[in-house]
């Protein structure tokens, strides 16, 4: 979490808090943790897809490890809902490494910049009490100005150096 200056946000939301993987570390900030099946008392039983922030928050961070679902359908829905809420300006999610691909990054409109990608170590997850490997990274997307947008740009790899003859 040192990659994000948490003091810059009026509100921090963990939309799929589960057992508090992120929110346990964010408790000293103005934070809301949500889950449809909360595992801790401070986590609000709330469906992320029906949640909206108050308009009196200027800068909102959404952070967490959303469920991925088959072909990342659920993680994309979590992103899409965050993008609909106007005062959310940073989304920091653990996502499968397929989000390194341009086709998956296109979910973010042009005004969103990929600020940072932090590769998670092997066996960062547990399943039934056992370490479990899922190739994932922590992606930080923002509407703020960034030094360099790390979004994959396929145009950078187009060349005019070859002529194709069919």
Task: Please identify what each model-predicted range represents.
Residues 1-166:
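Class I S-adenosyl-L-methionine-dependent methyltransferase catalytic core
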């Amino acid at each position: 979490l040192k990659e994000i200056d948490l003091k810059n946000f009026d509100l921090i939301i963990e939309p799929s808090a589960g057992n508090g993987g992120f929110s346990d570390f964010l408790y000293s900030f103005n934070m809301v943790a949500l889950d449809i099946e909360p595992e801790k008392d401070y986590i609000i039983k709330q469906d992320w897809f029906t949640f909206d922030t108050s308009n009196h928050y200027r800068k909102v961070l959404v952070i967490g490890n959303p469920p991925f679902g088959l072909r990342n359908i659920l993680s994309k829905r979590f992103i899409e809902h965050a993008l609909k809420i106007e005062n959310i300006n940073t989304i920091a999610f653990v996502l499968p490494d397929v989000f390194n691909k341009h086709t998956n990054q296109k979910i973010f409109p042009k005004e969103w910049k990929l600020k940072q990608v932090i590769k998670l170590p092997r066996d960062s997850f547990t399943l039934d009490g056992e370490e479990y490997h899922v190739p994932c990274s922590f992606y930080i997307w923002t509407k703020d100005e960034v030094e360099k947008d790390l979004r994959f740009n396929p145009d950078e790899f187009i060349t005019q150096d070859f002529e194709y003859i069919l």
